[in-house]
């Protein structure tokens, strides 16, 4: 069975990590559905983390994409 997600903290979260040297990165509905399906089946919070680098591997910025229900949980703590 294929396990989706590059990083998994059992029972907490499942993270799909992406890296690009470009100034933009497209997140597709398919990407969201795959990580969300895998995370929810394990009772975990899904996330996609995108790292932007300078082309030589040096990190310039990093952002996490999470569902709005997860953001709501974080904001109401």
Pin down the residues of each PLM region.
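Catalytic phosphate/metal-binding cores of nucleic-acid and nucleotide-processing enzymes, i.e., regions
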Residues: 1-77
